[in-house]
Amino acid sequence: MAKLSDLTNAIVKGSLELAVSTTQEALQENIDPQTLISDYLIKGMEEIGTQFEAGKAYVPNLLMSARAMKGALELL
């Protein structure tokens, strides 16, 4: 079973590999793609955005997170 919190964490950490593998597992388990987007991917981008606003993350972190999200979205 896909651990969907890993998907949010993958986005926050900018881990393309983890984002893709978790998304693949979720799709194999027939989890609704819209749920993945709204409940996990966007949540991860919101978190990294909050960290950026607080000065705890920088532009490279945002770019890595965006790349991880793009990788997950390509599967959907």
What are the roles of these predicted feature ranges?
Residues 1-75:
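Long amphipathic alpha-helical segments
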